[in-house]
């Protein structure tokens, strides 16, 4: 039997040969320092970024977002596209439902002049286009809306009443087998939006399931269940929805965490609203009755007024966000070893009339 030293020498020789034949890094030790940290695409909600455990949607992976109608699935993906573009990336939107609203996308911060859009005729065409874009190596984020609308060519060309059992599931399974490796190699994130269906004859457990078979459940590194839980009102007028997202699968961090945030009509995810919620939760922002207070100064009466104040003063919003991230350990504290500075002065200058509340 070879000695441990001989086995280690043989392993080093084999690894060197693999690197020469297949490229450096084809095989590596799991704890190697050469492994790069996970890159992410922010979702637009700090609450969801924290729930995901890594600060956003992972690069080079498949993500599934599913939920009932009008729950915020497309809104969430458009925010991710806008964030990817702000970071200098290129995004593509494969609109199998033929329902993308350019005006709404622009309001959410998407650069529609730079966004690549395809409205394919069949499921095969949609997935082939996605595969070609991924293999180009130039795309950072691809969204497919939605899995349920990826209709196989045989179904489109057939008669209305024809049975096509398992066609879509086989199509998805084959496509995902091809896409997974290419996504990892090109560091491209692919988001599949999916719809809910109900199983017939289920008496125990949830009857809900998603379209497109089981392959996507296995290949997705992150699965997000998004639900509308409350209608936000300004007086009697509905102005948005309170949304809850549950991370039902997460290969990058512990799963089953939840996030809640506001989606405002015509605005999208309220980033400032999430800052207020998280600030109150982590005692960085104080709430007394209807008033929100930060470092002894009143931001506003009611969440809407406080949110508007943060929109008008992005430097204060950024300060609160940075403190939240430091407290949660998402970013390092640059002043950990430094003397505390009098940062409150800038805030007092912006709030002279509210001082002393």
Curated annotation (Swiss-Prot):
MF (Gene Ontology): ATP binding; ATP hydrolysis activity; ATP-dependent DNA damage sensor activity; damaged DNA binding; single-stranded DNA binding
Q: Which GO terms describe its biological process?
A: DNA recombination; DNA repair; SOS response
Q: Which UniProt keywords apply?
A: ATP-binding, Cytoplasm, DNA damage, DNA recombination, DNA repair, DNA-binding, Nucleotide-binding, SOS response
Among the entry's GO cellular component annotations, what is one? cytosol
Keyword DNA-binding appears in the UniProt entry: yes
- The reply to whether Ribosomal protein figures as a keyword in the UniProt entry is no
Transmembrane annotation, as ranges = none
Q: Which SMART domains match?
A: AAA
Q: Which Pfam families match?
A: RecA, RecA_C
Chief location: cytoplasm
What positions does the entry give for ATP binding? 67-74
Subcellular location per UniProt equals: Cytoplasm
Q: Which PROSITE patterns match?
A: RECA_1, RECA_2, RECA_3
Recorded hits in PANTHER family, A to Z, give:
MITOCHONDRIAL DNA REPAIR PROTEIN RECA HOMOLOG-RELATED, RECA
User: What family is this?
Assistant: Belongs to the RecA family.
Q: What does this protein do?
A: Can catalyze the hydrolysis of ATP in the presence of single-stranded DNA, the ATP-dependent uptake of single-stranded DNA by duplex DNA, and the ATP-dependent hybridization of homologous single-stranded DNAs. It interacts with LexA causing its activation and leading to its autocatalytic cleavage.
In terms of HAMAP family, this protein maps to:
RecA (MF_00268)
State the name under which the record lists this protein: Protein RecA
Q: Organism source for this protein?
A: Leifsonia xyli subsp. xyli (strain CTCB07)
